[in-house]
């Protein structure tokens, strides 16, 4: 199923007001960890899968990438990306990630931010990205952590006073569809285990260079005290793999 909630006007309006939409990369809590894993962009060709507003595309060009292609299923997302981009070396393609097709060995770097957990077959994406990368090329991506996606509810257990007791994990080994809620809308995500992420990459031919589970920094907790609970369970998984 190729899901496109972002072209729904109400859903998009809510997404547009999220911190990661209004503040860009600095509004994404996992960005410092993802940024630290990114390879050298200078004179590199880059593909961004699930590019959204194009923040990572523009960052790659700021770091002197020679060309960048952003792919997204949402027309509204790409309309916003075009409005924010005035660089002929960045191009955007309106297409589901599942349907991408590029020549072998076209890209030096492929990046994806919080998109692959909306894709049914991670195995297929691994095979495609491996083929699209040049030898020595890098795949860097973030997804919602399997501990976060295991249950449909994707929420804490609370006591009668509304205090967060713990983050429940259930049906972890049962991969597949999770009917969950995001921005008050019903959204389909695909849960897979930590080992599936790793093994699908290895089976496609990738070498795993780094695996990160970002934590809320002291500064984040100081500015937003509720963020301390984010360190009670991982929300994101970030992986750097090399062809």
Pin down the residues of each PLM region.
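Conserved class I S-adenosyl-L-methionine
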Residues: 1-41, 55-59, 80, 84, 139-176
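A short acidic, Gly/Pro-enriched loop at the edge of an enzyme's catalytic core
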Residues: 98-110
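A short SAM/SAH-binding and catalytic strip from SAM-dependent methyltransferases
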Residues: 108-123
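A short glycine-rich, Lys/Arg-flanked "PGG" loop and its adjoining helix->strand segment in the class I
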Residues: 123-138
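Short alpha-helix
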Residues: 188-211
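Core SAM-dependent methyltransferase catalytic element
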Residues: 204-206, 224-243
